[in-house]
């Protein structure tokens, strides 16, 4: 399966999200982790929280209300299925749906990026306002 096909699956997943930000605007974000072509985990934004979210947000003086972002939820789910040393073989896909046909920028926030680095995920592919982008996390930054 090609990366764009995986990202399209995550776009469909994002549509299922009903997370609402404090501003009242819906933010539909989905994330999936793949190890090669093997699907490991998927998640959507949630009004729930998790101790890991509190940890990363407090280090970065981030949101006062630590909502569980799709990226973090996918990492938490994957950590129950694979050993942390295997995250170095994974790619994180993130999509933000704006409406039925459009996507928006889904680059992970600072708190999620800290988790991505800590778990050693080397590649992130996410939607942008005009398509998609890929980021590679260098070894010294993980």
Regions found by a protein language model. Name each.
Residues 1-142:
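Zinc-dependent deaminase catalytic domain
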């Amino acid at each position: 399966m090609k990366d764009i096909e995986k990202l399209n699956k995550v776009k469909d997943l994002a549509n299922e999200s009903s997370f609402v930000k404090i501003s009242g605007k819906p933010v539909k974000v989905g994330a999936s982790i793949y190890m090669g072509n093997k699907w490991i985990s998927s998640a959507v934004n949630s009004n729930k929280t998790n101790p890991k979210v509190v940890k990363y947000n407090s280090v970065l003086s981030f949101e006062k209300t630590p909502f569980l972002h799709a990226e973090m939820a996918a990492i938490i789910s994957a950590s129950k299925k694979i050993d942390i040393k295997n995250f170095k073989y994974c790619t994180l896909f993130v999509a933000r749906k704006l409406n039925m046909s459009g996507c928006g920028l889904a680059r992970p926030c600072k708190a999620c990026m800290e988790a991505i680095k800590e778990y050693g995920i080397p590649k992130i592919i996410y939607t942008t306002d005009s398509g998609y982008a890929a980021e590679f996390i260098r070894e010294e930054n993980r």
